[in-house]
């Protein structure tokens, strides 16, 4: 510790000494500059000489301009001429003949002995004011009359010549004391630091001028410009992702390929809660009416909501796009319209479009490439389109030939082109027995079929229907439910055995029923629920697995290969709010449910959703057993009826 303290004290003393040296050096420099300024002020220019030089230069320039080379000057400067007490700087001769070339003084005679016969001597006349020049080279002696000029002594500092080359440069000689030399040696290590400080000062001086302050009018113009709104809408989503997690927040949903997830989300056969989607502003006091997952971006899900009675000034219909990939708590996109959205789906083959069916009967189309939250297209409220609530919207077909199919509760089915929603391409009245319109509450197309479909009605009856052909309209009738059909879904898993003829329905009669289009009676009735069953859906990857939700907030998963009496897995949400909708994710590993409070619950299914190689054959045997049991029960019923 003592060594460190001594070292610090020594450093402090050196710093103080350096500061004193700098101050002393600065003071001496200021005194030297002051003396030089005083000497410059005492100096006076020679008006005669300067005027003469100026005239000589003008004459030489004039002669050179007309092509005549000027002769050497007839007057040569003399350094000093001492004769008793006389001092001469210049000898100004009277006009002489052009043969005279130069003059010299006795003081310079010694240095000019080697100049040959052209040297001249200076002699005094009887008149002290006249000087005679005599040339040894001339044959005759000729006298030149000279005049005496006023002499003023001036000392000029020599001009400093700086040449930029690799040779060593030496400044003008300056007298320095030994103390100054020691000071410079002590300060020398700090030269680099001082140069850095000087560079920093220069950089600060050369900084750009501060930007001009915008006026309020210019600020408002920028805030309301379309470019700013598009930039702000895009940037705020990126910032929300960055605040939520450290994933690839710059992923763009406008056309880049999806990065597939690796590995299973959850191992095990039980349902585990993953996350919840809820927005305090847009979800509060609204009921989840429909949900759909995107085919192009499997992590995106859209949900539609009914009106909020506590906020009459808010839009009645809302559709929110949620993102499973990022942990942010706000929706990816917010869409709304002036009527409650009863059904919603992503437009297949158009990853940027979202289709919604409203309570007023309008079909609305949103585009996430537009910065507007309102629909970019909508159908008219006219007799040619829907005038009743639309609970069914679906895009069917192929990439090059597809249509939007919508059905309203008055039994009217319309086919639309997504490029033009002003008028439907075709429409059909779903009427039973040519007089009774079908109040459709649900619609489903079998996998790979765009012509035949099944619908559920408010009366509890299920119908098959056809879009084209001689049997267009309502076909078969399936009776079995004792209440309105709330959900209907066709078998979706594709495998070695085709089960596309199967479909399931849910109803207010607390049951879920399994059907086949080959028979108008239910194959099986699942009666484990104690409240309204609001929705049902097959797993997209497992042939024997489906999910259903009821009014008690319970989510049930049924694996028919394991058991047909009780659910394989079941979970009740917190608060026991009624669950209105259920939707499987495209990979079949997650299932989403929406409740009556506007919340969406995401559950991981785990290995329960992963099918084994023998699942299709096992499910075929299960169906055979179900048919056999149904046949036995029908025979027993017939015997009892006969008895």
UniProtKB/Swiss-Prot annotation:
<feature type="repeat" description="WD 5">
    <location>
        <begin position="480"/>
        <end position="525"/>
    </location>
</feature>
<keyword id="KW-0243">Dynein</keyword>
<feature type="region of interest" description="Disordered">
    <location>
        <begin position="167"/>
        <end position="219"/>
    </location>
</feature>
<feature type="modified residue" description="Phosphoserine">
    <location>
        <position position="195"/>
    </location>
</feature>
<protein>
    <recommendedName>
        <fullName>Cytoplasmic dynein 1 intermediate chain 1</fullName>
    </recommendedName>
</protein>
<dbReference type="GO" id="GO:0008017">
    <property type="term" value="F:microtubule binding"/>
</dbReference>
<keyword id="KW-0505">Motor protein</keyword>
<dbReference type="Pfam" id="PF11540">
    <property type="entry name" value="Dynein_IC2"/>
</dbReference>
<feature type="repeat" description="WD 3">
    <location>
        <begin position="385"/>
        <end position="426"/>
    </location>
</feature>
<dbReference type="GO" id="GO:0003777">
    <property type="term" value="F:microtubule motor activity"/>
</dbReference>
<dbReference type="GO" id="GO:0043657">
    <property type="term" value="C:host cell"/>
</dbReference>
<comment type="subunit">
    <text>Homodimer. The cytoplasmic dynein 1 complex consists of two catalytic heavy chains (HCs) and a number of non-catalytic subunits presented by intermediate chains (ICs), light intermediate chains (LICs) and light chains (LCs); the composition seems to vary in respect to the IC, LIC and LC composition. The heavy chain homodimer serves as a scaffold for the probable homodimeric assembly of the respective non-catalytic subunits. The ICs and LICs bind directly to the HC dimer and the LCs assemble on the IC dimer. Isoform 1, isoform 2 and isoform 3 interact with DYNC1H1.</text>
</comment>
<dbReference type="GO" id="GO:0000922">
    <property type="term" value="C:spindle pole"/>
</dbReference>
<feature type="region of interest" description="Disordered">
    <location>
        <begin position="96"/>
        <end position="123"/>
    </location>
</feature>
<feature type="repeat" description="WD 4">
    <location>
        <begin position="435"/>
        <end position="475"/>
    </location>
</feature>
<keyword id="KW-0158">Chromosome</keyword>
<dbReference type="GO" id="GO:0010970">
    <property type="term" value="P:transport along microtubule"/>
</dbReference>
<feature type="repeat" description="WD 1">
    <location>
        <begin position="283"/>
        <end position="332"/>
    </location>
</feature>
<feature type="modified residue" description="Phosphoserine">
    <location>
        <position position="107"/>
    </location>
</feature>
<feature type="region of interest" description="Disordered">
    <location>
        <begin position="1"/>
        <end position="65"/>
    </location>
</feature>
<feature type="modified residue" description="Phosphoserine">
    <location>
        <position position="177"/>
    </location>
</feature>
<keyword id="KW-0677">Repeat</keyword>
<keyword id="KW-0493">Microtubule</keyword>
<dbReference type="InterPro" id="IPR001680">
    <property type="entry name" value="WD40_rpt"/>
</dbReference>
<dbReference type="GO" id="GO:0000776">
    <property type="term" value="C:kinetochore"/>
</dbReference>
<keyword id="KW-0597">Phosphoprotein</keyword>
<keyword id="KW-0963">Cytoplasm</keyword>
<dbReference type="GO" id="GO:0045503">
    <property type="term" value="F:dynein light chain binding"/>
</dbReference>
<keyword id="KW-0995">Kinetochore</keyword>
<dbReference type="GO" id="GO:0005634">
    <property type="term" value="C:nucleus"/>
</dbReference>
<keyword id="KW-0853">WD repeat</keyword>
<dbReference type="GO" id="GO:1904115">
    <property type="term" value="C:axon cytoplasm"/>
</dbReference>
<dbReference type="GO" id="GO:0075733">
    <property type="term" value="P:intracellular transport of virus"/>
</dbReference>
<comment type="similarity">
    <text>Belongs to the dynein intermediate chain family.</text>
</comment>
<feature type="modified residue" description="Phosphoserine">
    <location>
        <position position="633"/>
    </location>
</feature>
<feature type="repeat" description="WD 6">
    <location>
        <begin position="528"/>
        <end position="568"/>
    </location>
</feature>
<dbReference type="GO" id="GO:0030507">
    <property type="term" value="F:spectrin binding"/>
</dbReference>
<feature type="repeat" description="WD 2">
    <location>
        <begin position="336"/>
        <end position="376"/>
    </location>
</feature>
<feature type="region of interest" description="Interaction with DYNLT1">
    <location>
        <begin position="145"/>
        <end position="161"/>
    </location>
</feature>
<feature type="repeat" description="WD 7">
    <location>
        <begin position="574"/>
        <end position="613"/>
    </location>
</feature>
<dbReference type="InterPro" id="IPR025956">
    <property type="entry name" value="DYNC1I1/DYNC1I2"/>
</dbReference>
<feature type="region of interest" description="Interaction with DCTN1">
    <location>
        <begin position="2"/>
        <end position="123"/>
    </location>
</feature>
